[in-house]
Structure formats: C-alpha cells, structure tokens
C-alpha cells in the first residue's frame, strides 16, 4: 500500500513538472518568436526611413533587406504547435488553420525574396518591392495577429 501511494505521488509530481516544463518551453519559443518579429519590424522601419531619405545610411539598405530575407525564411518555424500562449499577440487561427498560415507566410517569404532581388537596384524599385512585402505582412497580421 505504501509503495503504491509513493508511486502515485511520484507520478503526480512528475506529471506536474513535465507540464510546467512544457509551459516554460512554450514561453521560450514565444519569446524567441517575438524577438524575430521585432527584428523584422526594426529592419522594415529602417528601410522605410532610408528609402524616404529621412534617416539612415543608404549604403546600409542592402544589409537591412538581406536581414529581412534571412529572417523571413524562419517565420513559419517559430510558430510550432503548442507554442500559443494566452497573452501572446498570435491568434489561435495560426494553429487552427496551419495550411492558411503557411500560405500567408509563403507569400511573405516570396515578397521578401523579391525585395532581396532588388537590393542593388534603384530606390524607387526597392520602395515598390518593399510596399509589396508590406502588403504580405499586413495580410498575415489581419488574419493571424491580435489587433494593435
């Protein structure tokens, strides 16, 4: 009887520990995801300012574009199943409609790739490609992100 009780208690403790570890892992993934999205936002902002001639070094424009292209390839991977948290800006639709989300991310990746292809072009072409990428970003945010 005593061994059974100890076994039950250990099972409960281990299950609770595993659940806590899963939640911590989901929180870490969410923090990483938020870092990636903030980095994308930062590079987007830098591109807007440089293209508008308001701030920044035009010689660094290609660096910001390359960073976005690199980060874009990671977006789909930072939303694994089980990483949705209640206080996250990510809507459950990401996981409920994984195929639709993957398609939206693919549109963003394609637009980021097109922008990357323009990195050495003139500012007007870069601006046009950047605006197209912005539409892809907005499309994803409208369906899969909590309103700001």
Q: What positions do the PLM features span?
A:
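Positively charged n-region of N-terminal signal peptides that target proteins for export
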Residues: 1-4
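Bacterial N-terminal signal peptides
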Residues: 7-15
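A short structural micro-motif
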Residues: 14, 71, 135-136
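Short, intrinsically disordered, low-complexity terminal segments
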Residues: 15-18, 22
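A short hydrophobic/aromatic micro-motif that marks alpha-helical segments and, especially, helix-coil
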Residues: 17, 112-113, 137-138
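Extracytoplasmic c-type cytochrome modules immediately beyond a signal peptide or single-pass transmembrane anchor
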Residues: 22-131
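The canonical Cys-X-X-Cys-His
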Residues: 133-145
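Short Cys/His-rich "knuckle" micro-motifs
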Residues: 148
């Amino acid at each position: 009887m005593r061994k059974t009780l100890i076994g039950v208690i250990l099972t409960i403790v281990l299950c609770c520990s595993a659940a806590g570890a899963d939640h911590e892992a989901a929180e870490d993934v969410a923090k990483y995801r938020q870092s990636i999205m903030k980095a994308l936002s930062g590079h987007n902002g830098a591109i807007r300012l440089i293209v508008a001639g308001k701030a920044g070094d035009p010689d660094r424009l290609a660096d910001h574009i390359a960073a976005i292209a690199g980060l874009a390839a990671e977006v789909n991977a930072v939303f694994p199943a089980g990483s949705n948290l209640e206080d996250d800006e990510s809507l459950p639709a990401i996981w409920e409609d994984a195929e639709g989300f993957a398609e939206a991310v693919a549109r963003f990746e394609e637009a980021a790739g097109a922008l990357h292809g323009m990195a050495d072009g003139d500012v007007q072409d870069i601006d046009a490609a950047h605006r197209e990428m912005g539409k892809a970003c907005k499309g994803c945010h409208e369906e899969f992100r909590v309103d700001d």
